[in-house]
Amino acid sequence: DIFCGETCAFIPCITHVPGTCSCKSKVCYFN
């Protein structure tokens, strides 16, 4: 797993593919 670079609601955003994410309304959205 890869930490995408943002923490949302104190939880690191984790994805299975490289990339970045944004935190909106305490939910991680992945590009």
Curated annotation (Swiss-Prot):
UniProt remark on domains: The presence of a 'disulfide through disulfide knot' structurally defines this protein as a knottin.
Biological process annotations from GO: defense response
Disulfide bond annotation, renumbered to this chain: 4-21, 8-23, 13-28
Family indicated by similarity: Belongs to the cyclotide family. Bracelet subfamily.
Keyword Transport in annotation: no
Tissue: Expressed in roots and runners but not in leaves, petals and petioles (at protein level).
Descriptive protein name: Cycloviolacin-O25
Biological role: Probably participates in a plant defense mechanism.
Post-translational modification comment from the UniProt entry: This is a cyclic peptide.
Crosslink position(s): Cyclopeptide (Asp-Asn): 1-31
Classification of source organism: Eukaryota, Viridiplantae, Streptophyta, Embryophyta, Tracheophyta
SUPFAM superfamilies: Cyclotides
Keywords recorded for this protein, A-Z: Disulfide bond, Knottin, Plant defense
